[in-house]
Structures are given as C-alpha cells and as structure tokens.
C-alpha cells in the first residue's frame, strides 16, 4: 500500500485532479469577490461564504466524480494494458491486490479533493474577513433551520462547517473513486473511466431514476 500511495502522490494525474478542483472553486469565489470590489470589506461576503459558495452554487460537485476518477483510478487501465495486474496478482493474491488498489484510489481521490478545498478555504480566510455575523450582519447565512449548518456557522468562524464539508468531500470522492476503478476493470479505457462516473452523477442529479421508476 505504501508504494502504491507514493506512486499516486507522485503522479501528474493526482496533481491535475487537485488543481482542477481548486480552479473550479476559485472560479465562483474569485468572480464573486471581483464583482463586489467597490464595496467596503465589511459589507462583502465572509471567508466562509466564499469558501463554500462554489460547492453549493458553482460547478464543483459536477466535476467531483471526474477529479476523483482522475486522481488514481485511471492507473488501473495502464496496469491492465501492460499485464502488470496479472504479475502483481501472481506475487500476492487477487484479494490483496483489489484491497490495495481500492484503498489507494479512495485515499488518492480524497486527498486530492480535500486538499483543494482546504487550500481554497485558507486563501479566502487570508483575503476576506472571517465569518462573524455578530460583528458583521452581512455575514449572516440563511440556512434552513433543519440544516445541520444552521447553528454551526457561528461557532469559531465556521470551523465546524469547514470540517464537515472537508470530510464530506473526502467521503464522496472515495465512493466515486471506487466506481471509477470498477469501470476501469470492466472497460479498460482512460476516457470512459473518468467520464462514466461523471455521467452517472449527472443522471442521478437530474432525477432520471425518479422519472422512470417514480
């Protein structure tokens, strides 16, 4: 597992996935920040609002399956085409090989996406004012009372919200990484490995299952 993870973090795919996540988040927050450049700092959005805005209103979630698949799962296609998979399973066992590949894919996808969100949040906590609705009423976020973030965002400048979203992103990316790994095994093609998970998410997000089955 250690060697697999080292190869994951050294791979250009991992860094491309992390950069795509970061640029997607920045695409929303930077545009919103530049659009309010004429306003006083205390009347602009807080660091928390800018940090999570791209998740709720930007395209981050649409690209999450793509980035999760790209981080490591696509390497499975190379191992199959080069007969490396057969050699590695002969050295150990199929079960151990599957566990290592699945674990590395999940960890690689989680680290790539989580690190992008964390770096994005750090950047905006340096540039913008931390979330403090008591001092700055404009920092108030109107979450629904049933939402878990309703009371959390006022605690320690929204730290519980940052932590929960970070864990949620990592868990979601891990799930999509396993889906992509399964695609890579059944259909050993890099393009399909990254596009099929994205397509499945698009169908799920569009409520296609509800449309057909009610």
Specify the residue positions occupied by each region the protein language model found.
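Extracellular/periplasmic helix-loop-helix junctions in multi-pass membrane proteins
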Residues: 207-214
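Short helix-to-coil transition segments within interhelical loops
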Residues: 88-94
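Alpha-helix N-cap/helix-start motif at helix boundaries, enriched for small hydrophobics
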Residues: 96-100
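Hydrophobic transmembrane alpha-helix segments characteristic of membrane transport
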Residues: 82-85
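Central hydrophobic cores of alpha-helical transmembrane segments
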Residues: 17-23, 190-204
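Aromatic- and glycine-rich beta-strand/loop motifs that create alpha-glucan
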Residues: 1-21
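Secretory targeting signals
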Residues: 22-78, 103-181, 185
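Membrane-interface helix-boundary motifs at transmembrane edges
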Residues: 9, 183-188
């Amino acid at each position: 597992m250690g060697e697999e993870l080292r190869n994951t973090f050294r791979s250009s795919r991992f860094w491309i996935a992390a950069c795509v996540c970061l640029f997607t988040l920045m695409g929303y927050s930077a545009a919103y920040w530049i659009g309010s450049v004429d306003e006083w700092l205390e009347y602009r959005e807080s660091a928390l609002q800018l940090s999570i805005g791209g998740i709720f209103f930007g395209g981050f979630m649409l690209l999450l399956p793509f980035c999760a698949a790209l981080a490591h799962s696509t390497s499975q296609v190379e191992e199959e085409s080069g007969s490396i998979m057969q050699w590695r399973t002969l050295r150990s066992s199929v079960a151990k090989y599957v566990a290592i590949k699945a674990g590395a894919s999940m960890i690689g996808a989680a680290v790539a996406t989580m690190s992008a969100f964390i770096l994005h949040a750090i950047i905006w906590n340096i540039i913008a004012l931390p979330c403090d609705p008591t001092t700055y009423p404009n920092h108030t976020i109107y979450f629904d009372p049933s939402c878990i973030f309703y009371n959390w965002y006022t605690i320690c400048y929204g730290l519980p919200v940052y932590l929960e979203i970070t864990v949620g992103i990592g868990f979601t990316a891990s799930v999509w990484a396993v889906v992509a790994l399964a695609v890579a095994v059944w259909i050993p093609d890099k393009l399909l490995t990254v596009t099929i998970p994205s397509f499945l998410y698009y169908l799920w997000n569009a409520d296609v299952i509800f449309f057909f089955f009610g």
